[in-house]
Amino acid sequence: MRLRAAMIGVAAAALSLSACTTMDGAGATASAGNVPQLQTAYGAVTGTREGASNDVNVFRGIRYAATTEGRRFQLAADPEPWTSARPATEFGSECPQRPSGDVPVFKSWENSVGTSEDCLFLNVWTRGLSDGKKRPIMVWLHGGGYVTGSGSSNGYDGSRLAERGDVVVVTLNHRLNGLGYSYLAGLSDDPKYADSGNLGSLDIVKALEWVRDHADEIGGDAGNVTIFGESGGAAKVSTLMGMEQAKGLFQRAIAQSGSMSLAGFTPRLATPLAKDLMATAGVSSVEELAAMPIDDFVAAMMKSRSKAAFYRPVVDGRSLTRQPYAPDANPVSADIPLLVGTNNNEMRLQGGLGSPENFALTWEQLPAKLTPFVDDADVGEIIAGMRKAHPDYDASDVFFQVATFRNYRNTALRQAERKSKQAAPVYMYRLDWKTPVEGGRLETPHALDIAFVFDNVARSLSYTGPETAQTKRMADLMADAWIAFARTGNPNTAALPQWPAYNVQQRATMIFDVDPEVVNDPDSAERELLQRLLPEGRSL
């Protein structure tokens, strides 16, 4: 048990909380009514038992850091200890954020949780408490870019994954948007704001430290932690792989549909956004920005040039000295195995549901639609090359695939290429199974993989459609591969064809579908064309 020595007195006091409470291990207790209890470094919490066999201990809303109210733009502090057991049965508040809008296919995942600057909470699903078993720990980082989201989505419920693989699942909240990624170091000499550009990532580091320090108590192995995430969560995974502060806190990494851009977001780019936020808020100092009411702060973010959307980690020379896969980056994660991939039609979600006219484009309309995604590349050359590579594609197909490559696949490929030169292996996948929702027009869109990785099809029906033999098959294939990777650093299972590590010679890629297959360099003509003509991709 690696608890802070300063908290020994708190832990001792908690042992005498109730005469009807009995010890069930060094740091966990089980009280009357079979209610699981967990002793943390700061005090005890009580949870629930869930899962198909009622054998998963669940703790929601465990505080891993103190409230940031009154300490905006500053590093997270340890929580104040408590003496009486606190219930951990409800999710903690989310970070204040702009409304995410109504996305019908995400309806099943909605979970109404309030927002507050007191938002540094995590959630745990585990089959054992202080039982001496060294279970792999899987720490999920939520999507939403760096601006929205939380660890409380119904799609992230860890019960089935914990039960299926006997792993520990952890999800968490951290600071987002201007609260977690406003680079203010150039606008104030006060050292307490020196890390303001990367606070969200440093919050995650603090949560990982909590996991390390409580691994025994939650039935896990501090030496076998996998960080995994989708979309913005995958970008956070990539960021952590370049942070010295995170070294040793995880041993494997999975990046789903959101590898970090390989181009740096520097103080030169970040400082003008912070200045614009201050001007929009009507304040002249960082201190005033830190003190203004949170509702006014969020309103100012939404009106500013960033629109509360353009925030990301900053290469500040402190917590992030280089982008993780830049040629001159410090290879702090060279020994970390990586699983990385995308969905085949990512942009049919963002580029389709929000703009339904894109499902019926003409060839005449296509050049103007593609221009925002290709920067200075020759649109005509891209269209001609795509039509040659995919003779059966219509104009909408070309639009969605180029946009998908630009925003997702290219960065995943570049990350895998550079990772393959390091000591630890990298494995590449692509999800091809098509959802029937929206009349099938979404095909294999962004975030569809979440339902299968968590084995949560029943919680994802608005996105996957009804439970069928196919959806069960997809959950079996993907959840078991992710569990295998978390356990051993290798995603191969008996149900999959042999899955080699990725290299630039073969480019072996697992195609996840009802009949999975390994394909070397899938859609090679498309890849060669677009990697030659497009920049390396966008950061989420």
Language-model features, listed with the residues they occupy:
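Alpha/beta-hydrolase active-site loop
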Residues: 119, 193-216, 272
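Active-site loop->helix "elbow" adjoining a glycine-rich segment at hydrolase catalytic centers
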Residues: 143, 199-203, 231-234
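Short glycine-enriched nucleophile-adjacent loop
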Residues: 234-246
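Catalytic nucleophile serine of serine hydrolases
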Residues: 229-232, 244, 257
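Substrate-access "cap/lid" subdomains that shape
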Residues: 108, 206, 213, 247, ...
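C-terminal motif of bacterial Sec signal peptides marking the signal peptidase cleavage site
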Residues: 17-19
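Non-catalytic accessory segments of hydrolases
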Residues: 21-198, 363, 376, 460-478, ...
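Alpha/beta-hydrolase fold nucleophile elbow
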Residues: 218-230
